[in-house]
Structures are given as C-alpha cells and as structure tokens.
C-alpha cells in the first residue's frame, strides 16, 4: 500500500478505483488492479 498526500490524482489513473473512508482515513481501493491501493497520510 502506498501513502500519498493527494489521492484525487491517483484515483484518476484507473476507472475501477474507489475512494473510501475507513476509521477517519481516506483510501483508494481497486478490486481488479490491486497495485493502485493507497492511503492518504
């Protein structure tokens, strides 16, 4: 999992990327291409 400052640009890299909030943190998850998984921090 990558840690990024801005997830909006990372989300635009693949059409299956989803922006989710869990436990006060923002994540990008992708079911088909798992290498796009990231957390904001």
UniProtKB/Swiss-Prot annotation:
Gene Ontology molecular function terms on file: structural constituent of ribosome
Family: Belongs to the bacterial ribosomal protein bL36 family.
KW Metal-binding (keyword) present: no
Keyword Transferase among record annotations: no
InterPro entries given in the database record: Ribosomal_bL36, Ribosomal_bL36_sp, Ribosomal_L36_bact
Source species, domain of life: Bacteria
Recorded GO CC terms: ribonucleoprotein complex; ribosome
Name of this protein: Large ribosomal subunit protein bL36
Organism whose genome encodes this protein: Nitrobacter hamburgensis (strain DSM 10229 / NCIMB 13809 / X14)
Stored Pfam families: Ribosomal_L36
GO biological process: translation
Annotated keywords: Ribonucleoprotein, Ribosomal protein
